[in-house]
């Protein structure tokens, strides 16, 4: 089912010169919907925890649930920060390091975010009729696209170890955050 229809008839497109790695670019770009879906799943999970009652009180009042949601919020914030950083790097034109770091961080966050969201919801989170699964299934799909955690960790390692030992610190702290 389509949500919208776009037409680009008679639209002029300017071709820009680009010599980058398509896998790196794709890995960078996919972090935005990953981060957005994690935000949505977090909002749904917090809302559910604040509505669902068990043992006479809202499950969001239980310390264990609060702790898990705090970890989820941290992971979602990390994914958002990583995605923002890689898009700033894309604007600068030097994004290999940020792409590897961002996709790796978003993949790591995806594991925790989906685990926690489904634990908070219990079985209802997996049902086709409940909205949570539409976000978590997308997160898992995007996580597996354009390279695994091991792939991006290797990329990040290759980039950092290719720096001259004397210039490594400058390379790390001199990254412009846009």
Language-model segments: residues:
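Flexible, small-/acidic-enriched active-site or ligand-binding loops
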Residues: 1-18
